[in-house]
């Protein structure tokens, strides 16, 4: 069955069109656009008009593509920014009405579970690290946790200067360590780490020296802790305008990559990981599997949800 999965993330809006058969997900098309849906949500607790407009413009393009490719089911999953926003459910209802997608607002636990489904089978000694714009999930065979350690959220809280000052970076690192120490379950231990999502894949691309992003080279790359520290030091020293011009880094990710790199450095230190394996399979692939299990749409049915938003 051909399906479409959409990830309404805090920093990016992503599309995967895939053929799902017997639990296997074969990519047909994959798109990513930085829309910063979570901009301002941490302080205002609302999705704001401009980010909503960016997402809607993106979804208009995505719907055109998934329809042209013949997707039979479409599932849009929403994570941290929509969870935190008081108008989040109304926003999803409006998307269902406007675009015809089935939507799901995921809890942190559900987000972790869907990410794990997307990554695929992992060993008992493996922890999956998912650093998003609004949250970071650590997912092990025994324990798992969803934290409010997101690259957008922490950039807005801590990194006001351009480039960030040492004091700001230190305060950010202390905050990350405190959350990890307080919230990581005791049974969440790892000999091996798998990293997913844009912060980690971007750092992998920089470590590989890619001028243009190549998912085939990024997937499976072992990103060492020394490489994370080196890229963080390099990126944090650059003003935003120069960071946007770094070869291999998507310009619109430049504002939040420093906070994301701090989170990764501290997570690896906390878990005792000397390296992390980078994966291109993530929550999108889990959402594709979930989309394949949706019932067939009924012609003329109105989608559920609230239809007035924001």
Question: Model features per residue range: what roles?
Answer:
Residues 24-35, 39, 69:
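N-terminal glycine-rich anion-binding loops that anchor highly charged ligand groups
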Residues 7-12, 129-135, 196-200, 280-282:
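A short acidic Gly-Thr/Ser loop motif
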Residues 74:
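Conserved ATP-binding/catalytic motifs of P-loop helicase motor domains
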Residues 1-26:
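N-terminal basic/disordered segments at the start of proteins
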Residues 3, 17-20, 40-71, 81-125, ...:
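Helical "lid/coupling" subdomains associated with nucleotide-phosphate turnover
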